[in-house]
């Protein structure tokens, strides 16, 4: 068969391309799930006052978004061969990356106020009293940031997809 110059050559995804995509998505799912579990299991009691994630709406949203991100990343990893090259994949990736980034930024903002306080508004740094709780929150934020970066790379790779190999 003779190809004309005006015809575009179809690039086919190799097994390595699919493996990289699946690996990125599974790592994102694992880090996002770990972040949600760390926050949900995190609590500390001092002087009869128990602090856990249900006291702050931003942490409840953070856990919910991380669980949604986990399910999405695992589902797209499982269906990577079929989903690769679909027009909707990049858009769905972008939505999930932005949700994860927004949840991480919101929780990080509350975490920074808890860590350093805000004299102008009269908010005191509570991490001096609840150090273990704040350290676990910081670890969860780091894990969530890793999930954002991993999904961001997967999103960038889905922007110019190669077609899955035909079997």
From Swiss-Prot:
Keywords, sorted A to Z: Cell membrane, Membrane, Transmembrane, Transmembrane helix
InterPro entries according to UniProt: CASP/CASPL (IPR006459), CASP_dom (IPR006702), CASPL (IPR044173)
Cytoplasmic side: 1-17, 76-94, 157-167
Disulfide bonds listed in the record: none
Pfam families tied to this protein: CASP_dom
Cellular compartments annotated: Cell membrane
Membrane topology label: Multi-pass membrane protein
Main location (coarse class): membrane
One GO term describing the cellular component: plasma membrane
TM regions (residue ranges): 18-38, 55-75, 95-115, 136-156
UniProt superkingdom: Eukaryota
Residue ranges annotated as Extracellular topological domain: 39-54, 116-135
PANTHER family according to UniProt: CASP-LIKE PROTEIN 1U1
Family that this chain belongs to: Belongs to the Casparian strip membrane proteins (CASP) family.
UniProt subunit comment: Homodimer and heterodimers.
Record NCBIfam families: A_tha_TIGR01569
Protein name per UniProt: CASP-like protein UU1
Source species: Oryza sativa subsp. indica
